[in-house]
C-alpha cells in the first residue's frame, strides 16, 4: 500500500490496487465522526458507443443513468431499506463519464463497505423491476428539463459541441428512456462494471489497513470476472 503525503493539508492518502484491478484510495480523518464510501465506475452518459466482446454497440442516450437506478435492487429487497435499517445514508449519481455509488455512516464500517461492494457487483435485473423503474426515470428526466439551471448548462454545451455526447442530457430524453431495453442495460453492466474499470474512495473516520483488508476479502468472496475488454468509440469534433 502506497502512502502519499499531502503537503498542503498535512494528511496522508493511501493507495492500493487489488489483484482484480480495483483501485482503492483512502484518506482517513479521525477528527470527524463519519466515514464516506464511494464506489465508482468509469461509465457515464458519453459512453454510448463502444466495442465489447468483438461487437460494436450504439446504445440509447441515458442508459448509464438507467443502469444506476436499477442497481439499487437485490433479490431479497431494496438496497435503500437495508441501509436504512442500519442507520446509513446512500445515494448515487451519473455524470458524463462516471457513475458513483455512495454510503455515509458513523458506525458498522465493515457491514457498510461489504454491502456496498456486494450490491454493486451482484446486480439483480428483472423485467418487472426494469419496467417499473422506466416511469420513475421518465418523470425525473422531465423534471430536469424544467430546471432553469440544467437548461442553461445543457444549452451552452449544445452550442459548444457538434458531435460530442456532452451536448446531450446525462439522463437522455423521455424518448431515449422509452427506447432502452433490459438487454442493453445488462450489456453495459457486463462491459463497464468491471473492477479494472472502477475505483473505491474512502474518507473520514476509519482505519485504512482494516478497510483494505475488508475490501480485498469481500472482492475475493464475490469472485468477480475482471476480463476487461471494452474500447470506447468517441465521435470526433470538427477542427
Annotated model-derived regions:
Residues 17, 74, 78-230, 234:
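Charge-rich, well-structured scaffold segments of protease-associated domains
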Residues 1-79, 186-239:
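His/Glu-rich zincin catalytic helix
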Amino acid at each position: 500500500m502506497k502512502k502519499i503525503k499531502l503537503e498542503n493539508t498535512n494528511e496522508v492518502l493511501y493507495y492500493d490496487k487489488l489483484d482484480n484491478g480495483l483501485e482503492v484510495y483512502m484518506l482517513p480523518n479521525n477528527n470527524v465522526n463519519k466515514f464516506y464510501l464511494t464506489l465508482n465506475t468509469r461509465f457515464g452518459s458519453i459512453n454510448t458507443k463502444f466495442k465489447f466482446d468483438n461487437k460494436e454497440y450504439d446504445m440509447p442516450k441515458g442508459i448509464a443513468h438507467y443502469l444506476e437506478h436499477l442497481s439499487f435492487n437485490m433479490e431479497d429487497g431494496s438496497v435503500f431499506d437495508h441501509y436504512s435499517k442500519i442507520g446509513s445514508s446512500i445515494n448515487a449519481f451519473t455524470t458524463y463519464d462516471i457513475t458513483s455509488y455512495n454510503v455515509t455512516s458513523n458506525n458498522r464500517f465493515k457491514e457498510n463497505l461489504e454491502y456496498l461492494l456486494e450490491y454493486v457487483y451482484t446486480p439483480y435485473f428483472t423485467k418487472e423491476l426494469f419496467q417499473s423503474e422506466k416511469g420513475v426515470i421518465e418523470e425525473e428526466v422531465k423534471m430536469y428539463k424544467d430546471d432553469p439551471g440544467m437548461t442553461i448548462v445543457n444549452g451552452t454545451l449544445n452550442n459548444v459541441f457538434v458531435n460530442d455526447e456532452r451536448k446531450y442530457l446525462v439522463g437522455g430524453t423521455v424518448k431515449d428512456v422509452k427506447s432502452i431495453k433490459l438487454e442493453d442495460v445488462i450489456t453495459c453492466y457486463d462491459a463497464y462494471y468491471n473492477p479494472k474499470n472502477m475505483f473505491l474512495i474512502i474518507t473520514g473516520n476509519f482505519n485504512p489497513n482494516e478497510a483494505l483488508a475488508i475490501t480485498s476479502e469481500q472482492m475475493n468472496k464475490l469472485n468477480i470476472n475482471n476480463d476487461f475488454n471494452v474500447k470506447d468509440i468517441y465521435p470526433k469534433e470538427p477542427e
